């Protein structure tokens, strides 16, 4: 798949993870709804599903891996930042086919698109520290 298809998959996965965090609904139901509501012709659908379901299944482990690198408890983070850190942590830990620099850069871009003003700086700082523990 083209890098653009993966970026679109990450964007959709971020939206699914955010929705899952807010609603508590089953991630499979959220994935299905996202696929119905969006034009998926230029999205790596399998990658989207892997990211969204992978985060939902492994979120506790991902949160624990990132938490030591935070200045406040994970559950006090902004919901968007929480979703971005979970998504990127999943990529770093479970998707070794994705170079760590790509995973971090894509997360920074997501933070610029969806996060607060300096969210991208925060995400970058946390991931720069956490990558050593996530990617062994």
UniProtKB/Swiss-Prot annotation:
Family of the protein in this entry: Belongs to the NusB family.
Role of this protein: Involved in transcription antitermination. Required for transcription of ribosomal RNA (rRNA) genes. Binds specifically to the boxA antiterminator sequence of the ribosomal RNA (rrn) operons.
InterPro entries listed in its UniProt record: NusB-like_sf (IPR035926), NusB_fam (IPR011605), NusB_RsmB_TIM44 (IPR006027)
UniProt keyword annotation of RNA-binding present: yes
Keyword terms: RNA-binding, Transcription, Transcription antitermination, Transcription regulation
UniProt organism field: Pseudoalteromonas translucida (strain TAC 125)
Protein name: Transcription antitermination protein NusB
HAMAP family noted in UniProt: NusB
Coiled coil: none
Membrane-spanning intervals of the chain: none
MF-aspect GO terms: RNA binding
Gene Ontology terms describing biological process: DNA-templated transcription termination; transcription antitermination
Pfam families, sorted: NusB
Example of a GO cellular component annotation carried by this entry: cytosol
Keyword Membrane: no
Encoding gene (name): nusB
């Amino acid at each position: 798949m083209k890098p653009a298809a993966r970026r679109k998959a990450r964007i959709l996965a971020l939206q699914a993870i955010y929705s899952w965090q807010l609603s508590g609904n089953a991630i499979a139901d959220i994935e299905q709804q996202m696929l119905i509501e969006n034009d998926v012709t230029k999205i790596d659908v399998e990658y989207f599903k892997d990211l969204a379901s992978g985060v939902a299944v492994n979120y506790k482990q991902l949160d624990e891996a990132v938490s030591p690198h935070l200045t406040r408890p994970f559950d006090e983070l902004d919901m968007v930042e929480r979703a971005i850190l979970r998504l990127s942590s999943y990529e770093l830990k479970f998707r070794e086919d994705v170079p760590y620099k790509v995973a971090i850069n894509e997360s920074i871009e997501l933070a610029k698109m969806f996060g607060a003003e300096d969210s991208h700086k925060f995400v970058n700082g946390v991931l720069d520290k956490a990558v050593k523990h996530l990617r062994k």
